[in-house]
Amino acid sequence: MASQLRLRSALALVTGAGSGIGRAISVRLAAEGAAVAACDLDGAAAQDTVRLLGSPGSEDGAPRGKHAAFQADVSQGPAARRLLEEVQACFSRPPSVVVSCAGITRDEFLLHMSEEDWDRVIAVNLKGTFLVTQAAAQALVSSGGRGSIINISSIIGKVGNIGQTNYASSKAGVIGLTQTAARELGRHGIRCNSVLPGFIATPMTQKMPEKVKDKVTAMIPLGHMGDPEDVADVVAFLASEDSGYITGASVEVSGGLFM
């Protein structure tokens, strides 16, 4: 989908921006004209993402803003709150678009999964999304600003998957969190939606055995795995006023998998 500069006045915070879907989202939002605050646990990876971004709204060659990289472990409350403070200090305003894309997997069968692996996936994928959503919403409400919060869940959060009890639970929780936030924050002019990617070609899915990839691909009606840019297209739509009457939605980007 071609960019349309729908976000020329927006400041977008993207967590998990150092690679994969988060990086593609950062690139797409910048192409739409947004200033991007790219955050990752790996600060160097976030800086690499920023180097890929053009000047916000610079179709005529005149820079109208800047992008910046941030490092944070969003699973920690003080770090998540400090991230929002640092973004506001850098850009002199809170982000009007917030995309929580930070996520991890630690796969194991239910019978053998350690409590540590359960806790860590829940901490990053669900608690981290809660902490960023809360801090961003608090900043927006305090400033009186409108906003769009977009949380990256997964189709696995809807249907489950063998060996991923922790991941599926965390992503199901993101859907519930987002729907509840939509109910609570709508009166403040803040829209909240979740995006449910299917099997997308990312560093995370590259770890899958080829036999598993082939089996999954055969189940997808469109016949192929998605690209990170497919998810970024949907996020750009949800970030823009083109989706101004959409909140509480869970948008699947799965090629029809599990429909």
From Swiss-Prot:
The lineage of its organism: Eukaryota, Metazoa, Chordata, Craniata, Vertebrata. GO terms for cellular component: membrane; mitochondrial envelope; mitochondrial matrix; mitochondrion; oxidoreductase complex; plasma membrane. It holds the Pfam family adh_short_C2. The active site is at residue 167. It comes from Mus musculus. The modification N6-acetyllysine is found at residue 66. One of its GO terms (biological process) is protein heterotetramerization. This is (3R)-3-hydroxyacyl-CoA dehydrogenase. The keyword Repressor does not apply. GO terms for molecular function: (3R)-hydroxyacyl-CoA dehydrogenase (NAD+) activity; estradiol 17-beta-dehydrogenase [NAD(P)+] activity; NADH binding; testosterone dehydrogenase (NAD+) activity. Required for the solubility and assembly of the heterotetramer 3-ketoacyl-[acyl carrier protein] (ACP) reductase functional complex (KAR or KAR1) that forms part of the mitochondrial fatty acid synthase (mtFAS). Alpha-subunit of the KAR complex, acts as scaffold protein, required for the stability of carbonyl reductase type-4 (CBR4, beta-subunit of the KAR complex) and for its 3-ketoacyl-ACP reductase activity, thereby participating in mitochondrial fatty acid biosynthesis.
